[in-house]
Amino acid sequence: MSKTYVVDIDGTICDWEPGRDYTLSRPITERINVINKLYDEGNIIKYYTARGMGRFKGRSDKAIETFHAITESQLDRWGCKYHQLILGKPSADVYIDDKGINDNDFFGN
């Protein structure tokens, strides 16, 4: 039975520079390969990011307008397989979720 995986981008499948210059983000290939394998196994992959949400004080419309094309291009360039890219995730220091898992625990590092 397939599952739906919602995956963060920055700090999860890529490293990003201080100050959040997303164009300088570097892919973490090993992690992308794990997510791509889940995709290949028939699971649904959704990337969900807070890119721009802090900068635009929670205005998802501005974050989407500014960062959607850049982010989509990066995911494609990095070879990410996915079904959906969602911007507008609220910016936070801590996310509490009954279905959440820490990225280091998930990827085993």
Regions found by a protein language model. Name each.
Residues 1-109:
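Catalytic phosphate/metal-binding cores of nucleic-acid and nucleotide-processing enzymes, i.e., regions
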